[in-house]
Every structure is written in C-alpha cells, then in structure tokens.
Amino acid sequence: MSTGHKSLSPSDFVNDENQSVGSSSSSFVPVEQNSENAIQMINENKQFNESILNYIEKSTSSSDIGNNYHIISVFGSQSTGKSTLLNHLFNTNFDVMDESKRQQTTKGIWMAHSPLVSSTLTNGSKSEENIFVMDVEGTDGRERGEDQDFERKAALFALSTSEILIINIWETQVGLYQGANMGLLKTVFEVNLSLFGKSKLDKNDHKVLLLFVIRDHIGVTPLENLAATLTQDLVAMWDSLNIPPELSHLQFQDFFDIAFHTLGHKVLQPEKFTDDIKLLGNKIIDMHDSGYLFKKNYHHNIPVDGWTMYAESCWNQIDNNKDLDLPTQQILVAKFKCDEILNLVYDEFVLGFNEHLLADAPSKSSDTETSIDYSELGLSFMQMRNATLENFELAASKYNQSVYEQKRAALSLKINNKFSELFEIYVKDLVDKYTKSFTDTVSFGKKKLQGNTFHEGITNLQESIFQEFSQNIALISLNGDLEYDNHVKGLQLKLEQMVSKQQIVELNSIITKSLKKLNNGLGKVIVEELNDPKSDTWDNILEKFKSYVDSTVSKYEVGAGEYDFGLGTSLQSNIGAINKFKYKSWVSFHELIHKYISKDNVLNSLKDRFDDKFRYDENGLPRLYQNGHELDNSFNESKSYAMDILPVLTIAKLSDGTEILPDYDIFDKRLRNQYGGASVVTADDQQISIDTDSEDEEEENPCFAEILSESDKAAILAKFKKEINAKFVETKRSIIQNVTQIPYYIYLVILVLGWNEFMAIIRNPLFFTLALLLGAGAYVMYHLNLLKPASIVAQRMIDESIVLAKQKLKEFLLDEPETHGHNLNKISGNKTPPEDESIELDNLDPK
C-alpha cells in the first residue's frame, strides 16, 4: 500500500529518465525515425511529475494548443505488448520488453506526444490535433505480486483523465474474468463512480471511450461475437456495482462508449499486424472514417495547462483515498464463481426452454384454433423454473451466503424475464383468439348474441370472455410472479373499443336505412308534384317530407326528448344520432330538389307547357292558324301560361308566400363537420371549434329555398324566349306561304306560247290519256318522295335492255351463218366444214 503522496520536481525525475533511456537502449528499436521520447508522468513510487506541462509545450509546435489535444491511455496485463502497440500506432518511444525475457518493462505511468499516427493515408498522417498517449504499468505482474494498490490507482487515474482508454487483451483472454481484468475494472468503475460520479450530474454528456484492442486475432471467432461477449460482461458488471443512491438512475451507457478492434499476430502475421495497426490509425485521424473514435463529449473541455492541473488533482485524490480498498478475496471469489454457476445453469435452462417450450409456442403460421391445456402448460413452467433454481442451489450454496442469495434472486429474475417472453406470446395468442371470437359473434348482430337486445347480448358475451381469459392467463403466470392484470385490462379496453365501434356501425346503419327509405319516398313525391306544378306544390312536398321524418323518429322515442335504439349507447349519442338523421334528412331534401330541378329541366318544362298551349287546342288536336291575329293572341296566351310555373320551379315557396326554412342550417360549416361525417355524433363532437366558419365569413350565405339564382333564371328566360320566338316565326311563315297566289299573267303567257302543243294533245285521245297518266304518276311519286327511287329503277331497266340487245345481236351474227354452213355441207356430202372456213368463223367470236 502507498505510504503517502509526494510530488517531485523536474530534477527528481532526471535520474529516472536517464535510467529508463539507458535500460531501453538495448531492448527497444524505434518504429519510425521521427518517433518521440516519453516522459514518466507518475513513477513506481506514486510520485507525480510536475514538469508534464513543460514537456507538452516543448513537444508541440504551437505555443498555445488550448483545447486542441486528445489524451489516450492504454491498460492491460503485463507483457501483453501495450508499449509495442503504442509505438507502432503513435510512433512513440516507449520502452518495450526484451522478447527473450518475460519481465516488467513499464514502471509507473509514462506519457508521450504522438508526432505521427500510422495509417493507410500515405503510410501515416499527422493528426490535425495533438495526441498524447499514456502507457500505464501492466497489471498482474510478478514484481508487485499481491500488492495491487498501484495498478488499481493507475487504472483509475487513466480512466478519469483520458478520452479513450485502450484495453489491450489477447483473444484468448476474452471471456475470462481475471485474464480480461474484469475484476479490476469492476473495482475501478465503482470507485470512479463514487469519486467522480457526482460531476456527472452537472456535466451529464461527458463519456469515456473504452477501446478494446484484441491481440493475436486469428479470425476463427468473429469480432462481432467477441464484442458481444465483452459488452455483455461490462454491462453485467456495471449492474452489480454498489452505486450511490443519488446516481442509481445512471446506466453504464451514460458513462462509457465501447469500441473494438483486432490485430493480427505480430510475429506470425507481421504484415497483417501492420495493416491492422494502420486501419486503427484511420479511425483516430480520419474524421470521415465510419469508425472515427473521437467525439466532442469525450473531451474534458479545459485547456491543456488546466488538464495537467486536473490530472495532478485526480492523482492526489486517488492516491489519498482511504476507502479505495477492495472487498475481500473471498467475496470476489464467491461473486465470480456464483456468476459462473449462474451462467451455466441459465444456459442449460435456455436450451431446454427453447427446445421444449418455445418450439411449441403458437406462431402466426400455426393454427390459432389448436386447443391448449393451460393448466398443464403452467405446470411445466413451474417445473422447469424450480429445476433450474435447484441446480443453482446445489452448486452455489457452499459459497458466501449473502452472495449466494443475491445471485439466486438474480437468477430467479432472469428466469422470470425469460418466461415473460413466452408468456407474452401465449397472452397475445389468447387475446387474438378471444378478439376473433368476439368479432365473429358481434358481426352477425343479434343473430348470435344471447339476449333480447344488442346491448344485453354484447354484455353477456364480454363477461364470458373476461372470465375465461383471466382463468387461462393465471395458470401460466408462475403463481402470479408474471404480472397479468394489465393484460386483462388491455383486453377489456380492446373489447370495449370494439363494442363502441360496433355500436356506431349499428347506429349508422339505422340512420342510413332510414335516410334511404326517406329518399325513395320523397323522390317519388317530388317527381309527381313537378309533373304539374301548382301554387300548393311545395306545401304538399313539405308535408310529405315531415311525415317521413316524424314516423322514423317516433319509432325510437321512449320519452320527451329521449331515444333508445336498443344498442346500449348513451343518451347523448342517441340524441346525436336523431339530430344527425334530421340534419341529413334536410340535406337529402335539398339534394333531391336540385336533382330534379335544374336549368335544363326547367327550360324543358317551360317549352312543353308552351307547346301544349300553342300547338294543341283544348281537345288535344293540332292547331291550324288562319291569320296572323289569331296567331298573335295564341302566342301571348301560351307564353303567359308557360311562365306561370317559373316561380314554382325556381324557389321553394309555400302557398302563403313564405319560403321553406329547414330546422338546421345545412350550409353551416360547423354543422357539416358535426353531422355530415360517417360517424355518429358523441359527446366529444360537441367540442368542435367555432372558428371553422372563419374562412367563409365573407362569403354570402346560400338560401335553402332558392333553387335557381337570378342569373340562372335570366339564362333560362333568354333561351326560352329565343326558342318560342323561332316557333312563332316558323308558324307565321307557313301562314304566309298558304295565302300566297300565282300571278294571273303567268297563265296567259303559258296559254299563248304553248297553245299549239296543248291543242295537239287535246285533239289526240291517246296522247291526252297518256299525259294524264304520266302527270298523275309523277304527282303521286313527288308527294311520296319516290322520284329518285323511280329514276334509279328506270336507269337499271335501260341498262338491262342494252345488255339484252347486245346478246341477241351476237346470236344473230354467230349462230345463223354456222347453221347455213352446216346445211350446205350436208348437201355436198361433207361432214365437216373446211378448216379455213371454221377458223374464219371462229375468228368472229369476240375475245
């Protein structure tokens, strides 16, 4: 143990430094020619060197580096190559071990400035920031034996003053407790927490990076697996610390970050060792590298001269702390062995758990309807947990009793946590099953519900499901060790939400069906009334509309202002549903009016009404006007008759002159948001903001009774007048054509010029009769529009006659000479005509 702290002057370290350089000259060869000598920061007698600041100022090119620096320390077992690692990586000149001897080389704590960091960037690059590295005396050395006081304090000092603590271990040490210095780290973490943890409350973003450099990595075990093992060990170790109450909320991740890097074997794989060193150098100097190590919250945020004072103060506090003694070795052994046994039996438990229980757990791909005996399943849970705890008790109960009980409780908690994963799977499966069963039953409505009403049936179904679910889930809860009340409440809440949604669906269905019935009936009434508009048309339509609404509302009214749909919904919801029905009834009324009354429909109605009066008389026979005076009177009368229905079709006004006013302002945006959606109004819907109409404040409010605007009416009248004026002009033109006569002098001209021809026809009865027939036929065909078809038939007859004439001429020219020649041959005794004559006759055949 230390006998006390003593700071040395620079002259006190001269002999030590000379001895170090002398001792290292025979065993150390610089990695690079530009490597820099180191200075002993704390000697083996725990004395702090006050000349550190002078060394820093001399070793840097800038006189004032301020915060532009980084501190890196290395920590690890003795003779594991810590100094060699620093020399190769940072081009420092730390003393290294003679490979022919296994003995302590580094004594105390040494510091050196890194002039160059080895990397793949042009075979090494100078960092933009100054890097100082501290080489800490190795742990577990035979020179100090069981005196571990200095190595613990040195490790604690390095952890408290550095941004990055390099933990140098061999691959074969991963997973070991002492070999990986886990025991020492645990003590250092605990003391560091007690000494410096309170500053974390004021500066909660500061962390230290623990960089594990795994040496002699041959690649059989992936880095990911090694990292997982070390991370798990560190987190577990932190959770077991004696943390002060005021810091109990802080976790390992609040103090430390972890990084990992592997190096090949220096002797057997020299090239890979060098390459791995350079890759690590990239992470230190290349800020664009994905594994860049330095972060802002690692720095202590004090100038370098302040850091030297801070480091000296830390060492004073660490060296003079009387409470730094570690627990007894018996406690350490008990903790280590109990942890080892705990991990062993827990691994066996997990193996059996995965093989026998987890494999049989329900999954998405499995049949969710498979029957499960939850009583038997819960018994198997208990048997497996008890067997695991008995195995731990058998092997670990011989160690320290308090440690054993603590670890047994931890094991029981881990087992329960593992079972909770499976428990959640079965709970989710149960929830899915009962939810599906509930949904299937509810979807059929009253058909499958046991009750007189929907509300009574749904209540009975909920109670049945809650009781069965609670019984099954309690059987697999490890006698209540696994909390399940929240799951029961969750299912209850879920079913209540489903019931609420189904109530809304049923309520909306009632409203929708009622509105559909109203639309069908009211639509027919509107069509019938508009076929023959009268002054009381809108009185009849409004009366029918109100009768439809009142008959629907009265079906569900149970009292003055109270309604019941038999769904178990609240009074507020029922009133909201009735209000919604009434509101949407007026909306449907408005839509039906505009559906059957449009600009085109009104125009057609006016034209039809005008035609009925203008073209037909009281008996329905077509009118034949004899003179213009009669036409003018009929036109004015028909026009007035048609215009009488225009006010009825353009505004919904009762016979007493009042306009139809709806019970709800269907154009109010707030009411549209409240009643116009798909869902039924609930109590929450009353909280809709009244600011929703702010956008329409400047717009003119539309009128329910106004069917067509004044501009629409003007357009209809313009088209109507244009069309009836055209009909008037057409009718008047026909009257003028009928009264128009041929001038008499025309007949005189015809008589004088055609007298001879006329008399020739008159004197010849044949010509006279033929002329009469032809004239009568032409007259008939003209009136029947048959002149063109007749001309086509005549043309075809002429064409056929020409073809027939050609054929007869051909027969005459070819057949008659051949017949005469044949007869002459018989007379002369020749049976066949001469060849030349036959050929000549053949030549007459047309080609």
UniProtKB/Swiss-Prot annotation:
Biological process, per Gene Ontology: endoplasmic reticulum inheritance; endoplasmic reticulum membrane fusion
Compositional bias of kind Polar residues: 1-22
Primary location: endoplasmic reticulum
Species assigned in the record: Debaryomyces hansenii (strain ATCC 36239 / CBS 767 / BCRC 21394 / JCM 1990 / NBRC 0083 / IGC 2968) (Yeast)
Keywords: Endoplasmic reticulum, GTP-binding, Hydrolase, Membrane, Nucleotide-binding, Transmembrane, Transmembrane helix
GO cellular component terms given for this protein: cortical endoplasmic reticulum; endoplasmic reticulum membrane
Lumenal topological domain residue ranges: 763-765
Comp. bias (Acidic residues): 835-847
Subcellular location field: Endoplasmic reticulum membrane
Positions of the UniProt region annotated as Disordered: 1-31, 820-847
Cytoplasmic membrane side: 1-741, 787-847
UniProt-listed Enzyme Commission number(s): 3.6.5.-
Official protein name in the record: Protein SEY1
HAMAP family per the UniProt record, alphabetical: Sey1
Family: Belongs to the TRAFAC class dynamin-like GTPase superfamily. GB1/RHD3 GTPase family. RHD3 subfamily.
Domain GB1/RHD3-type G, residue spans: 66-297
